[in-house]
A protein has these predicted regions:
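Short, contiguous alpha-helical
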Residues: 8-12, 16-19, 29-85, 128-178
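Acidic/histidine-rich alpha-helical segments that form the ligand environment
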Residues: 78-125, 141-145
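N-terminal export signals and maturation junctions of secreted/periplasmic proteins
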Residues: 1-5
Length: 178
């Protein structure tokens, strides 16, 4: 397996598991917080998708995120440049749209990511994202994306377990060690 296949398989795996884990959640499950200032599944799902959207825009040197070009910001009742990702408490108040909208954005970003990665070659992984920051390469950006996605997916799994002690990873999405 080469590096591009590994990156692609990692992103597909986390996407399939994420969509399968979130499919069918109720509004209460999306909005439930283990503690008053903790994140809920809806926010984490939005954050993961928004982050992936931004990282793929950077890596591909695209002009704008799907958040703007496809008008997803409107479905979240936001402006193109909001919400401010540095405003942690403001983000907690981000109004969550329906699960369908959340998953729709997630799927659209995944499809864009897959299309981009299918056209990347190994040499491009070592290319800097910008000339003034040589150490930040396309490969580093994609590695960070995979780590970020898996970390936050673990949070969603944990919250699902708190919500329902009989919940387990969807069949076929867990790790099988032989």
């Amino acid at each position: 397996m080469d590096a591009i296949d590994l990156i692609s398989e990692c992103l597909v795996s986390v996407h399939v598991r994420l969509v399968t884990t979130c499919k069918g959640l109720t509004v209460d499950q999306l909005e439930w917080r283990p503690k008053p200032n903790a994140n809920n599944i809806g926010f984490i799902l939005w954050h993961m998708t928004r982050h992936q959207d931004t990282q793929i825009t950077k890596a591909s040197k695209a002009i704008q995120d799907l958040w703007v070009t496809d008008g997803w910001f409107q479905q979240f009742s936001q402006t193109p440049d909001s919400p401010d990702p540095g405003d942690r408490m403001g983000l907690k108040a981000l109004p969550m749209p329906s699960l369908g909208v959340l998953l729709g954005y997630c799927v659209a970003v995944h499809e864009r990511s897959s299309a981009y990665i299918s056209n990347v070659n190994v040499v491009e992984l070592d290319q800097p994202l910008s000339p003034d920051r040589q150490m930040f390469t396309v490969g580093n950006c994609l590695r960070h994306l995979i780590t970020h996605q898996n970390n936050h997916h673990g949070q969603i799994d944990y919250i699902r377990g708190l919500q329902d002690e009989t919940w387990d990873l969807p069949v076929g999405t867990g790790v099988i060690v032989i």
